Amino acid sequence: MKKAFSFLILVFLCGMFSARLSAELSMPHIFADHMVLQRNEAINLWGSASPKEKVTVELNGQKTSVRADASGKWNATLRPMEAGGPYTLIVKGKKERLAFDDVLLGEVWICSGQSNMEFRLHAAMNAEKEIADAENYSFLRSFNVKQEMSHRPLSDLQGEWRVCCLLYTSDAADEE
């Protein structure tokens, strides 16, 4: 019985160790389809992979490779680019590949506030006109961060990028 228990502990520990060695290639939720990256500034990208894994990032003809550190964290920087898009951001590891589509380079604004930041366009006095015009602004994007409490800094945010469109300006947006 003692040998069987020791064997199970050994198998468990080996499983934990091998899982740490083969981490999944990943990036925080802020990197996603429909994102906007700041134009005319160095573009910083980061995530995690297996320790010491080579990670290659590609965007709009630029390509750079970095190596994850011993804990699997990696950081890559692309040179500044002019406004434009849509592009596809490709991130490749040894065995995995991430692709983020409909990526724009432009102005990034960070807005924060209280309940007034959750005001929906359909409640505005000129809502019909603004909603009708919304399809003309597909280059406008928003990343709505889900409310979350934490007593320490977070390495990821829960949320998603949205294209300015009828869905985002309608009652359906209130169902989030």
What annotation goes with each model-predicted range?
Residues 141-167:
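Short, conserved helix/loop micro-motifs enriched in His/Cys and acidic residues
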Residues 100-150:
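An acidic-aromatic substrate-binding cleft motif
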Residues 53-112:
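Extended acidic/polar, glycine-enriched regions
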Residues 8-16:
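Bacterial N-terminal signal peptides
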Residues 1-4:
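Positively charged n-region of N-terminal signal peptides that target proteins for export
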Residues 168-176:
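Single conserved hydrophobic/aromatic residue that forms the stacking wall/gate
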